[in-house]
Amino acid sequence: MRVPLKLKFYNFISKFIQQGKTPNFSMDAPKRIRKGEELALDKLKKYLSNNNIEANELLIKQFPSGYSNLTYFLKSSTQEFVLRRPPFGVKSLQGGHDMFREYNVLKNLKSQFAKVPDVYLYCDDSEIIGAPFYLMERVEGYIIRPNLQQKDAPKKEIIQNVSKSLVSSLVELHNINIEQANLNDLGNINGYIKRQVEGWIKRYNHSKTDSLQNMDFIASWLIENQPLEVKGSIVHNDFKYDNLVLNKDDHSKITAILDWEMATIGDPFMDLGTSLGYWVDKNDLPELKLFQLSATTLDGNPTREGILELYEQKSGKSIINPVFYYVFGLFKIAVIACLLYTSPSPRD
């Protein structure tokens, strides 16, 4: 998908992306808890015990990845869990920081979509650890991080299978019967594209530090070129490699999909557009490959066009205006980069 509009993004995003070291193709291991993000161990142990969860000799560590909600590893003498809570000091617990909403998505989706972790408990008492939280299954496996080098990557055939599984899983998610999943109240498809475009433009205007004519042009273009809405589906809104947990014994299989905080009812093609925005091709401009946000240039990966064709083939749907969805995905990712750049802390 060679779109002249995308050229306007490259110089912009390269100003804001801050490259950090992330794990290569390895187990996503928890680390020591970051200073200032410790949990009240005694209160948590008592609460878990009162809710029939064994908490003797409870060990707590923290998963280092992620820029929104905080994720902890809990291990007792007999069990392992993952705890999710909002960042410390966050002003609003709505939207992506709403723990009950995220818990409810996973709980209800599990019966229709096997690739979500089980959830065990939700707590709305902020007196326990300072904020609402929930416990979910710890899914062990491998995660393909953005800076994975070719020399460390799985075989070409495995990457081919994983990329196909990514698209198949996205189509499977989009085909879920919303009513059977009891998620009718998750969002509203009516006006979804308009709300998304206006919402991300608003976030950009609140976070920009310079006058960027290219971004302003793209914002206007998105407003003027919105396609007709299609039938709504459950959308993930951040569907990419490093939100997939691969089977630890067979790396070509997806065991679980993580980070559901932005899930809603929306246009499935907008969800695909975000995935395409993350998808960097080998023949893309060097500027884009510098801040690659997903390991999509490894041998075995299809191109963006290949991902689009595979989605159409597996879904049986023809996407009339793929350029719009791709440009929206790029704009959204650019705004996220801008938000991270202007935030006092990556976790605010």
Task: Annotate each predicted stretch with a short phrase.
Residues 20-53:
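Juxta-kinase regulatory segment immediately upstream of eukaryotic protein kinase catalytic domains
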Residues 327-338:
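Hydrophobic alpha-helical segments that form the core
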Residues 58-217, 225-234, 249:
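ATP-binding pocket architecture of kinase catalytic cores
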Residues 2-24, 33-35:
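Membrane-proximal basic amphipathic "stem/tether" segments
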Residues 188, 318-329:
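All-alpha amphipathic helical-bundle segments outside canonical DNA-binding/catalytic cores
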Residues 233-234, 240, 247-306, 312, ...:
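Active-site Asp-x-Gly
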Residues 341-348:
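Conserved small/polar residues in nucleotide/adenosyl-binding loops
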